[in-house]
């Protein structure tokens, strides 16, 4: 199993819990870029190759195929 290219679940949670109004412009940009890359990596990885944590993260944050 590999989580290569995936955003850490803790980072995802922190990003979602912090309102954009409390983030700097570079932080907002970083979140958008890393969220997009994580979503693409999740869609490119088969369910059999995902760890339990990534499967749960995809289900919670809507990044599953």
Curated annotation (Swiss-Prot):
UniProt keyword Cytoplasm present: no
Statement: the UniProt record of this protein carries the keyword Flavoprotein: no
Compositionally biased region (Polar residues): 18-27
Region span, Disordered: 1-32
Bias type Basic and acidic residues, positions: 1-17
Induction record: By temperature-induced mass conversion from opaque to white colonies. WH11 is abruptly activated at the second cell doubling.
Pfam family, one: HSP9_HSP12
Disulphide bridges, residue numbers: none
UniProt KW keywords: Stress response
Domain of life of the source: Eukaryota
Similarity field: To yeast HSP12/GLP1 and S.pombe hsp9.
Name of the protein this chain belongs to: White colony protein WHS11
Originating species: Candida albicans (strain WO-1) (Yeast)
High-level lineage: Eukaryota, Fungi, Dikarya, Ascomycota, Saccharomycotina
């Amino acid at each position: 199993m590999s989580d290569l290219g995936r955003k850490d679940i803790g980072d995802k949670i922190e990003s979602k819990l912090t309102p954009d109004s409390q983030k700097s412009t570079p932080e907002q940009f970083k979140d958008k870029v890393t969220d997009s890359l994580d979503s693409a990596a999740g869609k490119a990885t088969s369910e059999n190759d995902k760890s339990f944590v990534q499967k749960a993260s995809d289900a919670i944050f809507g990044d599953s195929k």
